[in-house]
């Protein structure tokens, strides 16, 4: 449950609304739209984190978004650290530190 709460805080908090700019190396078609080679694009992370098709209650704090049968389950559209070759290099360390900070805070209360 702790991981579900942390992930939901990151989803709702959404510190970085857009991903790092990227550019395709060749002409690409996405969803019927042509994106010419070299065109700068960015993923709108806010639209992913609040997508009504992905999240049961997108504008409500609900750790249940990350629970299935009482067990933590990460969703594919949850990408606060981006994805691919340009994902945050410090993601593993940041996740560990967030978990340790949050659990230490809970132990004090």
Please describe what each predicted stretch is.
Residues 1-32:
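Conserved cytochrome P450 K-helix E-x-x-R motif and the immediately C-terminal K′/meander segment
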Residues 13, 27, 43-71:
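Conserved cytochrome P450 K-helix/beta-meander segment immediately N-terminal to the heme-binding cysteine loop
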Residues 32, 88-92:
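Conserved, non-catalytic sequence blocks in retroelement Pol enzymes and Pol-derived host proteins
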Residues 69-79:
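Active-site-adjacent bridging/hinge elements
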Residues 74, 92-109:
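Cytochrome P450 heme-binding "Cys pocket" and the immediately downstream C-terminal segment
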